[in-house]
């Protein structure tokens, strides 16, 4: 299943491991984000007197607090509550350094004080939301196969917790009105709409009378929602999709077909969708420029415990992922498309410790060049990410 490593990947990995003096990208001032109405406040993204400016968007994969992750958060809080921020501190410069930062919140939250559960029916501490906000996330999508693990109450608690800390959200809803609104975010003088959908909910039916509780994948609906977001004032539309085959490095046929169809969507001369961000497979998958729209088939897991395949074997790929970073440049004329002027990825790993810590894999490999597991993860992530020709389209590993 492991892709053949192209020469470009080998060169990039070798250069990275040799460049111990290179540091992480310089952080920009933090963006002010999400209000209880899921609309981020203008901050760095406010237009300058000379007009719109370029902005950066980062996106990460599944936040999946298994029981051992919950226990680590309790230990990090000294036994009093839950602190998920220490586990994410290693990637905070990357997240907070972007104008917009998007996460995928895989699970729903339990009531304050618990009880909390991991796999198979997740119920996470609501303190996760504060940690995500403090790390620098602007918005999280909440459409996944675990969205209905605790029914409508789980959705309500999750979105209430996000509202309380000012974290925007999209993909699940407490009422029909909320379901009809995308997350509208601001950066570079642009309004960015985020939409989110999942392939299913683990066989749990949508709650009676609540067909809008979680967005399910439907090509025509996604395109219609994207056009509605444009009508609501969005300059760019980002679609987060929970799809794919778990433990498969390569995108499946549904992913490839849907990506082509969504990227081909057009209303007049404007593309309907500007960026597609995939989650669910638990492993990193390829990036590809599809009909001028960058598509990330699978980001992998941002935060998870020990990961096991269906046959019971522990698989380290479940703790490897990529951070997508795209720089969008203003259109040459009003009404035209914002374009990606720089496309980058950052390899990431959850080091299982103890303690559990999410790390920028570039920095971790520079600090500990003798770690064979870091070198192996770096090589694999790079190989998979570039396996569908993204390097030729301009994608690079961030220096």
Task: Give residue spans per PLM region.
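Bacterial N-terminal signal peptides that target proteins for export
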Residues: 1-11
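Acidic, metal/ion-coordinating pockets
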Residues: 2-3, 23-399
